């Protein structure tokens, strides 16, 4: 359609951005994809010790006028604006705001619900840190959210509300209903714990001789028996197979496409097909692999947001 045509049309300047390898964290600036959402971007940012806010105003149409013009040669509007307590939420003295407008498409309730469901998968369900939270605020949906709360119907669940802080409560649902294997890998040792419906079965502590590059890895795997699948579907409003399988997080952020519906980046389904009753596939397992590392060279993500890690 026309949207796909626009994407193809604009690929050239996006590719130039990616190839420059200007990283925002472990990603290129193309990761933000603001131009796909709207026609303009107003970025406002301030440090805690600054007295003013820095602001840039980007008109994406300027990048499309001449595909041969390098993006570094295209001017964007820059200004400094006075700071006041109303600039950032909760009267914060620092922060960054990305204001995208006008939007390229209409965001109705169903689209916002899909956004919420996608964002909850970005939240590491077993992270012990509170570095940040994601909250959706959409005033026009307040009344409908209140109506959803009044329904005494299992069809309407917490995930159907648009407004509020996004949480990933998957592991709370599964914790006491199935068999779980937890693995912690440090530079010196590997600690494996088997838990069955909340009870510790056994622990194994081994010397880490095989994985010198892994010094802070946590793995949680859950076996999806029938009870776990039924409970998951009832609480989440979606079957586990359609939600995803084993997700990968690097330094607290999710790495795509690991865990996506139909994705076999872990090779589970391939191995399961090699023999009967010998291996578990993505339909049978749910969980996460969490890697914390400063070694971005060995665990570098590809420039595409859904390309996984560089092999």
Where are these regions (language model features)?
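Catalytic micro-motifs at enzyme active sites that drive phosphoryl/nucleotidyl and oxygen chemistry
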Residues: 21-22, 29-31, 81-88, 123, ...
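A short, sequence-level motif marking secondary-structure junctions
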Residues: 58-66, 151-161, 260-264
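Conserved, well-folded catalytic cores of nucleic-acid-processing
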Residues: 2-3, 40, 44, 122-125, ...
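GHKL (Bergerat-fold) ATPase N-terminal catalytic module, capturing the glycine-rich phosphate-binding loop
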Residues: 1-102, 108-109
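Short, well-ordered loop/turn elements at secondary-structure boundaries
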Residues: 28, 36-39, 92-94, 129-130, ...
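Short intrinsically disordered coil segments
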Residues: 73-78, 112-120, 151-153, 263-264, ...
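Charged regulatory segments coupled to nucleotide-binding catalytic modules in large multidomain enzymes
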Residues: 194-311
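Glycine/threonine-rich ATP-lid/beta-loop region of ATP-binding domains
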Residues: 86-238
